[in-house]
A protein has these predicted regions:
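Blade-loop segments of beta-propeller domains
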Residues: 56-61, 65, 94-121, 128
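Asp-box/WD-like beta-propeller blade repeats and closely related beta-sheet repeat scaffolds
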Residues: 129-181, 196-203
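Conserved blade-ending motifs and adjacent loop-strand segments that build the rim/top face
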Residues: 203, 245-261, 316-346
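Short coil/turn segments at the loop-to-beta-strand junctions that recur within blades
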Residues: 59, 100-107, 148-155, 200-204, ...
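Repeated scaffold domains used in trafficking and secretory/extracellular systems
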Residues: 65-68, 110-115, 151-159, 206-214, ...
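Beta-strand-rich domains and repeat architectures in extracellular enzymes and scaffolds
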Residues: 50-84, 288
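Short beta-strand elements that form the blades of beta-propeller/WD-repeat-like
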Residues: 75-80, 122-128, 161-175, 215-234, ...
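Blade/loop signatures of beta-propeller domains
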Residues: 21-56
Length: 395
């Protein structure tokens, strides 16, 4: 019955919202996020409440290439794509365990493509697109279940006894047209396809993979989903009803894609890159990077080479555009914080600082705790470092 209700909600939504127009009934209930020209601000005034986490180094916990970070029950879960493993650390960085089940056996994976945490059931959901399976572990790293799939999955969340699969990556991934033409797929507990929702607005081939197109709020069990190049961000509530939550309203000198331009967008790896072309023409382009904090939302217009942040205050409805490349203040701080955001918690952001950047900036930062932390961990055998911080909303 939940799947039927979910389907009916989508039918109603998309018969009434064929255009991204604020006159449409459901879109009129969405919150407007104004895109303005970037503000002039110093990095020293923007970044506050900096804290640091050093990850313990042992023979079993030396990390190579951190791809994803999740936090659950005071534990850090890190996907290392080079090591093909999930590493579990305490919140202060003490090593707990490594999940490494590589092989050809029935309880072994070939390669971890992505993982999410199931806050409600305290589980880890790992996806292996090569063997087309889901691996479910408890919060301590014990394998609970392996679920076979008929397709390759990248971003997949446990939901109401089943799963939600979010389309990401190149086109023609699925044998079913009902999956290929839609962004979100409902699966039952056995991994079988049940229904699809939210029609794909980028039907041309887009060889892009973003792990940040969704953000889950464990406090209210709601998901924010931002379709590739979309101007609308959707909310999926705990009953699997979907609504437009935010609509971008352009008041800047940048351009946003029209629905027609979005349908015609193409990115074929090594052949055609309309993302870079459009960015050079002044377009803001998002692959769907959305971060839902307690009091704010951050939308990252990733683009190709020059990302921009749209920082939205939930209580006032005011938004500011931040261009980290044109930030004022200390140059080394600007470079340190002009990095991908890996996780949020409360009103805090978590960034991973790779060792090459630690080596480059350790002696250049302003005197203080942050500089000392980088200097003390600037050794060949250190792990990448984690920085936790807040962004002060500009007055």
């Amino acid at each position: 019955m939940k799947y039927i209700l979910f389907s009916m909600a989508f039918i109603f939504l998309f018969t009434n919202c064929k255009k991204e127009d604020k006159q449409d009934p459901l879109l009129s209930q969405a919150k407007c996020v104004d895109i303005n020209n970037p503000i002039s601000i110093s990095i020293n005034d923007l970044i506050t409440d900096i804290d640091t986490i050093g990850l313990e180094v042992t023979d079993s916990s030396l990390l190579g290439d951190i791809h994803m970070l999740h936090i659950m029950n005071n534990k850090l879960y890190i996907l290392d794509t080079k090591g093909n493993a999930i590493y579990i650390f305490s919140r202060n960085g003490d090593f707990i365990r490594r999940i490494y089940h590589v092989g050809q056996g029935p309880e072994e994976y070939i390669r971890i493509n992505g993982f999410q945490v199931d806050y409600k059931c305290n589980r880890l959901i790992l996806t292996d697109s090569f063997s087309k399976r889901i691996f479910i572990f408890d919060e301590y790293g014990e394998l609970l279940k392996v679920v076979p799939l008929k397709f390759s999955a990248y971003i997949l969340m446990a939901r109401n006894g089943g799963f939600l699969n979010f389309y990401t990556g190149p086109k023609q991934m699925y044998g079913l047209k009902d999956m290929e033409n839609y962004n979100i797929h409902v699966l039952d507990s056995c991994g079988n396809f049940v229904a699809s929702f939210l029609e794909n607005q980028t039907p041309h081939r887009i060889d892009l993979e973003s792990t940040e197109r969704i953000d889950y709020n464990p406090n209210n069990e709601e998901i924010l989903f931002h379709p590739t190049f979309g101007n609308v961000v959707y909310r999926i509530d705990k009953n699997n009803q979907i609504y437009p939550e935010y609509v971008f309203r352009n008041k800047s000198s940048f351009k946003l894609l029209t629905p027609k331009e979005r349908r015609e967008m193409t990115h074929i790896y090594g052949q055609k890159n309309e993302i870079e072309e459009k960015e050079s023409e002044g377009y803001l382009l998002s692959w769907g990077c959305v971060y839902d904090l307690d009091d704010y939302c951050l939308f990252t217009m990733t683009g190709w080479n020059h990302p921009k942040h749209i920082y939205y205050n939930k209580s006032t409805g005011i938004s500011v555009t931040i261009d980290m490349e044109k930030m004022k203040g200390d140059v080394s701080l600007c470079k340190l914080f002009n990095a991908p955001i890996y996780q949020t918690e409360g009103n805090c952001f978590y960034n991973i600082i790779p060792l090459y950047l630690v080596d480059e900036l350790a002696d250049k930062l302003p005197e203080g705790k942050l500089k000392t932390f980088l200097q003390n961990n600037n050794t060949p055998n250190s792990n990448p470092l984690i920085i936790k911080y807040k962004m002060k909303f500009p007055e």
